[in-house]
Amino acid sequence: MGDAAVHATRAAALVEGSVVMKLASLKNGSRDGKLVVVSRDLKKAVAVPQIATTMQFALDHWSSVAPALAEVYQGLNHGTVQDEFVFSEQDCESPLPRAYQWADGSAYVNHVELVRRARNSEMPPSFWTDPLMYQGGSDDFIGPRDQIEVVSTEYGIDFEGEVAVI
């Protein structure tokens, strides 16, 4: 996996002014995970419950929490933050384990053709004039290193990776 893909899966990067912060949601047994600030090199993290308990809370209150998150991020990178711990992507949830919604547009005709062929389905004639877009269920996102659970291979399940822009 290239550096860009690793960075995208390990932490969500959010911009506050000219400061790029790396934030992640750690698994903690709750439905939304626990927000942590992650160091630039992705080696250390620190929980910030005094600022925001979840990524969703941080996004919903961005204008009021971003300055404090940026300060923690700078301190973490300069070694001046207490209670830091080793960051491990295996401990991560999806950045937003339960997003309000997500939409997917199938822009790659080759991919659509391959999937249709695998299911012995014809390409719909309308595909060439009407963009294929759908809204997906976002109640069960998984973390970047979680196992993909499949009840039975008899369903002919196909899966793909998606990129989230937060």
Regions from the PLM with identified roles:
Residues V6-V20:
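Short, Lys/Arg-enriched N-terminal segments with co-localized hydrophobic residues
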Residues V20-K27, R31-D32, R40-D41, P49, ...:
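Active-site microenvironments in enzyme catalytic cores
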Residues V36:
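Short beta-strand-centered aromatic/proline hotspots
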